[in-house]
């Protein structure tokens, strides 16, 4: 394997990193399913693409990457496949969401529904969960770990 592939699949056996990987994947997956499949009250692929491109002005290619990042990236985190790649994608999506969509709404979550939108504290938590995954990789019980052991470098 190349040096890049070695870095991509290299992992360690610390169980504590398993928790943020699986939890982040499980939290992000419903958002991806809303955008891609229309589950949980979402608008499916066509509706979401229309919203991103027409209302937010996001280029079509970037909108597709966001939808795939939230859906397939979350599945990648849950299974531990390409963990660093998926974590970086989600980190970039959450950073963009803070910058582009949520600064006017402030920090806090809109629990009462009286404000115009949601704050960005959820996004900061998701970013914080991505950082140890970028450092550690998939760790125990991950496809990355299986690949690294099966194909030693």
Residue ranges, per PLM feature:
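Extended, low-polarity transmembrane helix blocks
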Residues: 1-37, 60-68, 72-153
């Amino acid at each position: 394997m190349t040096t890049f592939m070695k870095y991509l699949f290299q992992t360690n056996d610390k169980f504590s990193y398993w928790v943020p990987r699986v939890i982040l994947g499980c939290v992000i997956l419903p958002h991806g399913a809303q955008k891609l499949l229309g589950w949980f009250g979402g608008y499916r692929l066509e509706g979401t693409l229309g919203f991103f491109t027409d209302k937010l002005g996001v280029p079509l290619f970037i909108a597709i990457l966001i939808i795939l990042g939230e859906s397939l990236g979350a599945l990648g985190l849950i299974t531990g496949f390409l963990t660093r790649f998926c974590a970086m994608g989600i980190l970039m999506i959450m950073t963009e969401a803070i910058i582009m969509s949520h600064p006017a709404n402030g920090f806090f979550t809109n629990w009462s529904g009286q404000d115009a939108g949601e704050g960005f504290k959820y996004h900061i938590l998701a970013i914080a969960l991505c950082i140890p995954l970028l450092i550690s990789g998939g760790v125990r019980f991950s496809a990355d770990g299986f690949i690294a052991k099966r194909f030693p470098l």
